[in-house]
Amino acid sequence: MMNMQNMMRQAQKLQKQMEKSQAELAATQFTGSSVQDLVTATFTGDKKLVSIDFKADVVDADDLETLQEMTIQAVNAALTKVDEATQKKLGAFAGKLPF
């Protein structure tokens, strides 16, 4: 069984690695799009919205509902990518905890 000092050292090491991974995620951009890429949304890994882009074909004042639906699709697709990358990068730390 590990002594307390070794457990604390290992926990501090894991914390530094996790902070580094979180910073890498925050610096990464994730883009999601709607059907036919008419709307794209880009977020950082810490879920800050960077941009929403609309193709001219989708902007129709008489059909705002379609634009809204496509925007939601693009945002949700981008956030799903962020969540998947976060789980992949940070989920590995859960199994490494010394206790």
Swiss-Prot record:
UniProt keyword annotations, A-Z: Cytoplasm, DNA-binding
Localization per Swiss-Prot or TrEMBL: Cytoplasm, Nucleoid
Disulfide bonds: none
SUPFAM superfamilies noted in UniProt: YbaB-like (SSF82607)
Main localization (coarse): cytoplasm
Nuclease keyword on record: no
Source species, domain of life: Bacteria
GO CC annotations on file: bacterial nucleoid; cytosol
MF terms in GO: DNA binding
Transmembrane annotation, as ranges: none
InterPro entries registered for this protein in UniProt: YbaB-like_sf, YbaB/EbfC
Subunit structure: Homodimer.
NCBIfam families the record matches: DNA_YbaB_EbfC
Function of the molecule: Binds to DNA and alters its conformation. May be involved in regulation of gene expression, nucleoid organization and DNA protection.
Protein family (similarity comment): Belongs to the YbaB/EbfC family.
Protein name in UniProt: Nucleoid-associated protein SSU05_0194
Organism name: Streptococcus suis (strain 05ZYH33)
